[in-house]
C-alpha cells in the first residue's frame, strides 16, 4: 500500500506540522470568509467545518459575491454531561457569536453551533475554554466524542460507566498543542512530543466510540467503530463486552461502500479498557486503508483483513486475551421522557427536543426555558444521543419549580407519540455541504404523516424507530432504523426497511429515489398489513422481514446491497 498514491488527506496531515497547517494565516485573512482547501480539512481536527448557506448560494453567485461562508463547531462533551453554569455559557455564546441564534444537540451526545462567522471563531473557542469546554477532536480523523448511556435510574452504574467514557476521551485526545496555540494564544513549546498514539498521520478516517449500559441501547453501540457494553454484577461494573467495526456511512450507487454493525469480540475487564481501546485504534492506524478514503473506516479494515486476524493482532497489542462474551439483553434505544426517579432518590426529567434544535419559537421558547432552568438547577444537564436533554439530579422539593419552567416554555406538555419519541434527523439543508435533500426542516412534518397513518390503522401504541438523513453519510444512523429515509435528491429519498427495534440488525433498501407521496403510500399499505397480520409483540422492523418485504441483513458486506 505504501507504493500506491495515498489519499490527498494523508499528505495534508503529514505536512501540517501536527494540525497547524496555515490555519493562523487563514484566520488573519478577513478578505474572505473561508479557509484554504487544505486548511478546511485540518480545521475539522479543531472541531469545526466550513459551510455556506445553500439557500442563498445561487443568489450570491448572480451578485458576483462569494458564498455566505460560516462555520459549524461541535464541542467535545464525553457522555454528554455539563453543569448548569456551563450551559449558561454555552447559551450566551449561541446568542452573541452565531447567526443561527440556536444550539443543536447532536446524535453523538454533544452540542454544536451553526452560523459562526470566521471573525468570531477565536472568541467563541476562547469562550468555551473559559467554561472548561473545548472542541478538540470533535471532528477529523481521530477518536471523536465518546458517548455514554445517561441512564437516569441506575445512577451508580451510570457513574461508573461515565468515568470509563471520560477516561477514554481524555486518554485518546491528540497531544498536539496546535489548538492551544492557534485558538487560546498559548506559546509554542520547544521540543514538542510527537503523538504517542496517532503519529503525524493520525487515523485513516474518523473513529467513533460509545459505552452502553444494558438493557438500554440509546447510544446505538453496534453502529460505532468501537463499543463497550457494560457488564454488571450486583449493581457494580465488572467489565465490558467489546464490539468493533460498526459505522453508518456509505456512498449512493457504490457497492464497495456499506453501513455495518460491529462484531462481538469478547469480554474484557474494566482495568483493561484503555489497553484494548488503544490496541484497536493502533491496528486501525496501521492497517486501515489510506489510499481509498471511502474505504478507510475500521469496518472495512476488519472485512478486508478478516475478523480472526484483526482480533489476534488486537490481543497481541493489548497483551491480554478476550474472554468469552457475557450474555446480555439489548433493549430499547429511546429515552425515558418525563420524570424518572433514580436510586439516589434524586429525580431526572427527560425533555423531548425535536431534531435537537434548541431555539426560541412562538409558543416554544426552548432556549429561554433551558436558560431559566439552568439558573436554578443544582444537578447537571445530560445530552442524549437521541438529541434530547435530561435535567438530572433534581431534589424532590425542586421538581415543581423545574417542571413549571419546562411547561411555561413548551419543553413539556406536547403530545408525543412513541414513534416521534424514537425519531431523529440530521441537520442537512441549508448548511450541510453534503446534503442532497432536506432532513431537520422537513422531518417534523414527515413524522406528522407517520403519526396520522399509525392512527388510521390503530397502531399508535406501537413505537417505530424512524430516522432521516439528507445524504448517505448516516449521521442520524438511518441504516439502523426500522424506517430509514436517506436523501437522494431534493424531495427524493431512498426508503430502507427491516432493521430491528433494538439496533442489532441493519435495514435494507426497499424503494429508491421516491417522493413523499410514494413513501407514504407504501407505508400506508405496510401499516395496514402490520395492524392485522403481526404476531404478538412483533415490532415493525421484524414484521417487514418476516413477510418478505425486505431480506434480513446478516452480513452487510454481502447482504446490504445484494
Curated annotation (Swiss-Prot):
It catalyses: hydrogen sulfide + 3 NADP(+) + 3 H2O = sulfite + 3 NADPH + 4 H(+). It comes from the Bacteria. GO terms for molecular function: 4 iron, 4 sulfur cluster binding; heme binding; metal ion binding; NADP binding; sulfite reductase (ferredoxin) activity; sulfite reductase (NADPH) activity. The keyword Zinc-finger does not apply. Pfam families: NIR_SIR, NIR_SIR_ferr. Its cofactor is siroheme; [4Fe-4S] cluster. GO terms for biological process: cysteine biosynthetic process; hydrogen sulfide biosynthetic process; sulfate assimilation. Its EC number is 1.8.1.2. Belongs to the nitrite and sulfite reductase 4Fe-4S domain family. HAMAP family: CysI. Component of the sulfite reductase complex that catalyzes the 6-electron reduction of sulfite to sulfide. This is one of several activities required for the biosynthesis of L-cysteine from sulfate. NCBIfam families: CysI, PRK13504.1. This is Sulfite reductase [NADPH] hemoprotein beta-component.
Amino acid at each position: 500500500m505504501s507504493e500506491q498514491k495515498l489519499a490527498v488527506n494523508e499528505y495534508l496531515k503529514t505536512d501540517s506540522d501536527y494540525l497547524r497547517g496555515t490555519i493562523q494565516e487563514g484566520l488573519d485573512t478577513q478578505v474572505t470568509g473561508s479557509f484554504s482547501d487544505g486548511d478546511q480539512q485540518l480545521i475539522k481536527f479543531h472541531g469545526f467545518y466550513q459551510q455556506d448557506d445553500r439557500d442563498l448560494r445561487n443568489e450570491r453567485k448572480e451578485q458576483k459575491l462569494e458564498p455566505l461562508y460560516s462555520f459549524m463547531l461541535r464541542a467535545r462533551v464525553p457522555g454528554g454531561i455539563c453543569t448548569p453554569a456551563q450551559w449558561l455559557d454555552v447559551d450566551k455564546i449561541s446568542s452573541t457569536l452565531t447567526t443561527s441564534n440556536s444550539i443543536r444537540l447532536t446524535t453523538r451526545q454533544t452540542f454544536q453551533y451553526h452560523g459562526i462567522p470566521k471573525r468570531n471563531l477565536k472568541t467563541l473557542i476562547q469562550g468555551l475554554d473559559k467554561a472548561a469546554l473545548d472542541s478538540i477532536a470533535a471532528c477529523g480523523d481521530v477518536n471523536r466524542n465518546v458517548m455514554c448511556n445517561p441512564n437516569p435510574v441506575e445512577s451508580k452504574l451510570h457513574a461508573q460507566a461515565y468515568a470509563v467514557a471520560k477516561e477514554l476521551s481524555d486518554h485518546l485526545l491528540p497531544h498536539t498543542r496546535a489548538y492551544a496555540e492557534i485558538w487560546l494564544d498559548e506559546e509554542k513549546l520547544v521540543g514538542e512530543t510527537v503523538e504517542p498514539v496517532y503519529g503525524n498521520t493520525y487515523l485513516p478516517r474518523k473513529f467513533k466510540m460509545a459505552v452502553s449500559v444494558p438493557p438500554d441501547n440509546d447510544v446505538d453501540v453496534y453502529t460505532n467503530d468501537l463499543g463497550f457494553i457494560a457488564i454488571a454484577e450486583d449493581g457494580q461494573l465488572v467489565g465490558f463486552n467489546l464490539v468493533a467495526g460498526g459505522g453508518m456511512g456509505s456512498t449512493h450507487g457504490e457497492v464497495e461502500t456499506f453501513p455495518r454493525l460491529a462484531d462481538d469480540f469478547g469480554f474484557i475487564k474494566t482495568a483493561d479498557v484503555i489497553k484494548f481501546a488503544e490496541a484497536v485504534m493502533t491496528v486501525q492506524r496501521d492497517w486501515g486503508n489510506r489510499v481509498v478514503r471511502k474505504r478507510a473506516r475500521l469496518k472495512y479494515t476488519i472485512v478486508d483483513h478478516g475478523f480472526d486476524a484483526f482480533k489476534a493482532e488486537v490481543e497481541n497489542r493489548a497483551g491480554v486475551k478476550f474472554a468469552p462474551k457475557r450474555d446480555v439483553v439489548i433493549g430499547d434505544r429511546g429515552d425515558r421522557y418525563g420524570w424518572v426517579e433514580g436510586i439516589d432518590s434524586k429525580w431526572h426529567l427527560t425533555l423531548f427536543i425535536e431534531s435537537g434544535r434548541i431555539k426560541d419559537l412562538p409558543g416554544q421558547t426552548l432556549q429561554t426555558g433551558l436558560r431559566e432552568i439552568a439558573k436554578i438547577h443544582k444537578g447537571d444537564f445530560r445530552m442524549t444521543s437521541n438529541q434530547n436533554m435530561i435535567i438530572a439530579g433534581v431534589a424532590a422539593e425542586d421538581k415543581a419549580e423545574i417542571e413549571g419552567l419546562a411547561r411555561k416554555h413548551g419543553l413539556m406538555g406536547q403530545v408525543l407519540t412513541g414513534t416521534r419519541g424514537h425519531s431523529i434527523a440530521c441537520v442537512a439543508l441549508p448548511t450541510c455541504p453534503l446534503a442532497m435533500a432536506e432532513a431537520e426542516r422537513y422531518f417534523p412534518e414527515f413524522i406528522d404523516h407517520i403519526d396520522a397513518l399509525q392512527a388510521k390503522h390503530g397502531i399508535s401504541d406501537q413505537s417505530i424507530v424512524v430516522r432521516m438523513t439528507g445524504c448517505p453519510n448516516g449521521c442520524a444512523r438511518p441504516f439502523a432504523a426500522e424506517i430509514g429515509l436517506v436523501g437522494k435528491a431534493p424531495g427524493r429519498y431512498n426508503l430502507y426497511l427491516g432493521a430491528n427495534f433494538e439496533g442489532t440488525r441493519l435495514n435494507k433498501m426497499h424503494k429508491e429515489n421516491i417522493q413523499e407521496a410514494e413513501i407514504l403510500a407504501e407505508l400506508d399499505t405496510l401499516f395496514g398489513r402490520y395492524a392485522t397480520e403481526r404476531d404478538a409483540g412483533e415490532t415493525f422492523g421484524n414484521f417487514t422481514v418476516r413477510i418478505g418485504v425486505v431480506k434480513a441483513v446478516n452480513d452487510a458486506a454481502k447482504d446490504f446491497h445484494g
